[in-house]
């Protein structure tokens, strides 16, 4: 469960050219709830750094298995839409 979310910054160039998009990331969440590893699965290059910068700051409640926190893999989609 996500306990702390940092919103990604909309990249200025993408905003200027009215571009929307999304980034899919593969994340390893460590036993302490931090993002241990982050890989880009897909997404427009304009949004990659912004998505990674935000998601690396996210914090999760650790997943517990048999009473012990465990590392898990998950996929995260960050969507960029302009307000109309």
Protein language model features and the residues they cover:
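Charge-biased low-complexity segments
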Residues: 1-84
């Amino acid at each position: 469960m996500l306990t702390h979310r940092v919103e990604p910054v909309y990249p200025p160039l993408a905003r200027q050219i009215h571009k929307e998009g999304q980034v899919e990331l593969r994340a390893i969440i460590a036993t302490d709830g931090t993002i241990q590893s982050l890989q880009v699965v897909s997404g427009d290059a304009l949004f990659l750094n912004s998505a990674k910068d935000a998601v690396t700051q996210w914090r999760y409640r650790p997943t517990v298995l048999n009473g012990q926190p465990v590392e898990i893999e998950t996929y995260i989609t960050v969507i960029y839409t302009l307000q109309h």
